[in-house]
Amino acid sequence: MQLNITGHNVEITEALREFVTTKFAKLEQYFERINQVYVVLKVEKVTHISDATLHVNGGEIHASAEGQDMYAAIDGLIDKLARQLTRHKDKLKQH
């Protein structure tokens, strides 16, 4: 899985990069064929926003989450992506 992290109005520190890498590695337990991941971390005034686009076999998955801090936004994003990946995997099994 290739992981690309971009920051808008936020500095991507080594700790933040490591947190994102660890969290996204856990997504492979839901769907093992994740090819590329694009993560955009943004700060707009007081809102922290994390967006992600996953390129997987059989399609593309996108999710976005907001939080009081960047770590909370990333946790929310991972929860949304885990649900979507589970749904995507079930959809592929049915066909």
UniProtKB/Swiss-Prot annotation:
Keywords: Translation regulation. GO terms for biological process: negative regulation of translational elongation. GO terms for molecular function: ribosomal small subunit binding. Coiled coil: none annotated. It holds the Pfam family Ribosomal_S30AE. Induction: Induced during stationary growth phase. InterPro entries: HPF/YfiA_ribosome-assoc, RHF-like, RHF/RaiA. GO terms for cellular component: cytosolic small ribosomal subunit. Belongs to the HPF/YfiA ribosome-associated protein family. Short HPF subfamily. This is Ribosome hibernation promoting factor. It comes from Salmonella typhimurium (strain LT2 / SGSC1412 / ATCC 700720). The gene is hpf.
